[in-house]
Amino acid sequence: TEPNEKGLEFYDKVFDCCKKHGIEPLVTISHYELPYALVEKYNGWASRELIEFYMNYCKAIFERYKDKVKYWLTFNEINCGTMPMGAILETGTIRGFEGPTDKVPDNKQERFQALHHQFVASAEAVRYAHDHYPQFKMGCMICFITSYALTCDPADEIANQKAMQISNWFCSDMHVRGEYPSYMKRYFAENNITIRQEPEDAAILKAGTVDFYTFSYYMSNCITTHKDADDVGGNIIAGKKNPYLKASDWGWQIDPIGLRYTLNEIYDRYRIPLMVVENGLGAYDKKDADGKIHDSYRIDYLRAHIEQM
């Protein structure tokens, strides 16, 4: 199938406009928009065949925009695939599912197999870009939800360590280090998950590591083994209430210092360039008498986070 020329022309105009105004584009290749036809026919990324479809897409846009785009991200918030809701958001492993979204069945074997195919696809795209377009810089994108142990109970510390490993570190370890970490091998064994791999996959993953790391940061959570802790709101990730933090109207805990902590942790782990690509505040915005929204609270939120950078 040939790419949609009108769609390609649209992004030509977007990138030309960016250049006109001195804006450097950063393109996410796949951002929660897997074509539903691929869900219906292949059960999304559960099928290895999607790697070829993804590469055809990458080759088309790389060649088309090679003189307009330098920075690329292979998948948006790929680590959401480690969570049950990731079957809808990230992996598309929902063939036959009609909703509601909070009732999506949790098939860990399917989700983590789909993630493996995405890791291989990402590595293939990075390797292809490096070989054919040496001016390109290829990155990953992680939904980073920093968490703390709620108490100094060692059981809480271990629970938080495991949560951070699965939710935050696993996918970026794959992208940056190019191999499965030991903690995931244990997780797979404990959850009866068997990742089917082709003989060449290990070499592909190792050869296709990213040049830079990007992430979204909105909030932090607390993790505990204690049953009496208060829950706190979130998006697809919920945790326990941190008594030292305020929360947004939506229950997301506001933690600017957590961003500083997160930047330190990520850079010490990987030693590659970092970029915060999502950050902001959701609120019940109301128009004042002049018909405008005077959201000084949002300015305060952004200022506090920028100061930590």
Protein language model annotation of sequence segments:
Residues 9-308:
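Active-site region of glycoside hydrolase catalytic domains
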